[in-house]
Regions:
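A transmembrane-helix-recognition feature enriched in membrane-embedded lipid enzymes
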Residues: 106-129
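Short linear elements at protein peripheries
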Residues: 124-145
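A general structural signal for short secondary-structure boundary/capping elements
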Residues: 90, 112-119, 135-141
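A structural signal for short, hydrophobic/glycine-enriched beta-strand patches
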Residues: 1-107
Length: 145
C-alpha cells in the first residue's frame, strides 16, 4: 500500500506498555527493512485495544482518512469502530497464512465486538491521550529508541 502510493504515511499501533515488550518498534523495523523512510512511520505506543488505537488515530494523530491493515477476522470490527468515530475508513486483510487457534480468536472476537459496540455508543477516552502528533508531520517524533 505504501509503495503503491495508497498511504503516504504509516501509523503503527500496538502495546508498548512494558519496557521489554514493544509491538510498535517491531512494526517500524519491519517497515524500515522494506525501505519505508523513517519519517513516514509513526508509532502509537498506547494502542492497547482496537478502540483505543482508532480513537488515538483520530484525536492524537489527527487522521481523517485511514486504511486499516489487520487480520480479516478483526478487520470488520476495526472498520466499524473507525466509522463510528467519524473516520473515513477502508480495510485490507493482512492474512498471509492460516493461523493455528483461529477458533479461539473467533470466540474472543464475538465478545470484543459486544464490548466495542458499547464503547462506540458511550465513546470513553482511551487510557492515554496527550498532545497532538499530526500524521501529516514527521514520524520520527514518535521514536523512543
Amino acid at each position: 500500500l505504501y509503495d503503491n502510493g495508497v498511504s503516504p504515511k504509516l501509523l503503527m499501533s500496538g502495546d508498548h506498555g512494558r519496557e521489554h515488550y514493544n509491538e510498535v518498534g517491531a512494526m517500524k523495523r519491519y517497515a524500515l527493512e522494506r525501505s519505508v523512510p523513517s519519517e513516514n512511520v509513526f508509532m502509537d505506543h498506547a494502542g492497547f485495544s482496537t478502540y483505543e488505537t482508532v480513537y488515538r488515530a483520530k484525536e492524537i494523530f489527527e487522521a481523517k482518512k485511514v486504511v486499516i491493515v489487520t487480520q480479516e477476522y478483526h478487520l470488520y470490527r476495526a472498520l466499524y469502530i473507525a466509522r463510528q468515530l467519524g473516520l473515513e475508513a477502508y480495510g485490507v486483510a493482512a492474512d498471509v497464512r492460516t493461523y493455528g487457534g483461529q477458533s479461539m480468536r473467533d470466540a474472543r472476537e464475538v465478545l470484543a465486538r459486544c464490548k466495542d459496540f458499547a464503547m462506540c455508543l458511550f465513546k470513553p477516552e482511551p487510557t492515554y491521550l496527550g498532545d497532538p502528533i499530526p500524521v501529516s508531520g514527521n514520524g520520527d517524533v514518535t521514536n523512543d529508541e
